[in-house]
Amino acid sequence: MKKVLSLVLATLLATTMIGCGNANVESTTDQTDVKETQVELGSAGVVSENTETSAQVEEVSVAISYDVSNLAPFTSATSGRLSLIQTLYEYLAYYDADSDTGLSGILMKECEKIDNYTTRVTIYDYIYDSAGNHLTASDVAFSFNTWAEAGNSVKCKLLDSCTVVDEFTVDIKLNTDSVGDVENMMCGLVPIVTQAAYEASDDGMIEKVVSTSPYIVTDYVEGSTLTVEKNPNYWQTNEDLVSPFSHSNADKIVYHIVTEASQVSTNLETDVVDIAANMTSSEVGRFQNTDGYNVYAIAGTNFNWITFNCSEGGMFYNNPDFRKAICYAIDANGIIEGVFNGGAKLSKAYANPECIDYNSEWDSEEYYEYNIEKAKELLASSGADTSQTIRIMYPQTTNNKSMAQIIQSYLLELGLNCELLGYESALYQTYKYEAGEWDIILDQKQSVDYVTSLASTLQVSGDTPAICLVDDEKMQDLAVLVQSNEGHTAENVNEYMEYVKEQCYVYAICQENFYHVTESSVNGIVTNFKGWLLPGCSTFGDDFER
């Protein structure tokens, strides 16, 4: 079964499937002695008919741990906004590896590639927003072009134009042929609104949202609560065409904005909320072995990695054996236990396993598994000067500091001394491009759609160097190749990944879990491809009460 990147229907011991344009779901729920369900973004099973049911509930209350700031569609993508946006707005499509195009529609009826730069999208002709405005192609073009002009995403500059072809068809043209960029815009960057509603808004929809979503904002108290209620006139009345993210199994959702992490769990324990979204690993332990709760562990889209300063004159320059020695000396499982209390997934490549082009065969290949004897052999063959102190630089966070300290202890076993350099974000962002400031970087990367979206980090682009500061013509050529539509083939992607491992320019360590915790009468949850929860799509038992 290929990955359906956008859906997580996490029923306990349940199976799910997303077809092309609709969702067929079968669930067999058995909660006996089950306290935690590990859910991977995009995981799915195969079923033949839709037998999944949810009670329709009057109200569900949810705690989110991020400040929302505002509800406008085209502002910067803060964590608070991302945790809400797919409840407030709809996108054209969602990722679906079983579809011929890799996408299935929400507002989109069909799409086709015109050329490597242009995608033609046709929307349904019966879409209306909550104010009764008929959504047409001109509104899609307005949304894309307004988003690009706002410039609040690094991807904005990639949009050349979005133009109307006919009343319900647009051409989305990019100025790059990089694979995945238009899909990213269609599935998670550009919310669609009608021009009439947006221009009629006196605050740019900062507080008063008008959209095609199955939910309508009825109350918003900044920094405190957001209330949405089911739209009785939701435009998509064909149940077979309702997207996995557009169900409304609760008549009302009340979000409680709780920015203090410890208070999220307290709100759940004291029945202030029924669902606690994005709970930290330090807080989730109290629910994992407690009756009355379901714990859903989500393998995050961010993963932790190290890279090496491969610039000329640096200690790792032109020395893959030295780099590999470092990797083999690091016990990634020890980091998972020591830093994340076991709440992380071991990485097997410089990629998120849920990416649509991830090769599952990589999971069975050797990937610098901890082997101190092999590390010593490689260190000896490298001829490296082991008297040098290795400077490990990282953005200053509690987890990064803990990981750096553990890595320091592992490398000491190899006879290598390290200096730990943790910097606040602005200084780190400056120093990471300066060869004289570091030898190893420890950081995180997010990967949510394509493996090759990270290839750009290993190439020189204008004045921006590769993350490892390497000047490698073959690496450059492979990185450019696999990011292009024509060059994005399984064979080329495998060659690219094999070369990255062969040269050991970067070592992915693990993906930290994050957790959604619910009352036990919430039998299943749905998240989007970035792991954000959609409470209205949850599966509620008949015994659910607010």
For every predicted segment, state its role.
Residues 112, 116, 154-198, 203-205, ...:
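Surface-exposed binding/hinge segments that line
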Residues 97-98, 186-252, 262, 373, ...:
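Gly/Pro-rich hinge or "lid" segments in bacterial periplasmic/extracellular proteins
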Residues 137-142, 169-171, 213-214, 248-252, ...:
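Alpha-helical secondary-structure segments
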Residues 109-152, 165, 171, 316:
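Aromatic- and charge-enriched surface segment that lines or borders ligand/interaction sites
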Residues 215, 345-381, 399-401:
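Structural transition elements
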Residues 236-286:
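Ligand-site clamp/hinge motif
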Residues 63-114, 122, 145:
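N-terminal lobe/hinge region of extracytoplasmic solute-binding protein
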Residues 225, 304, 329-358, 399-408, ...:
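Detector for C-terminal structural segments
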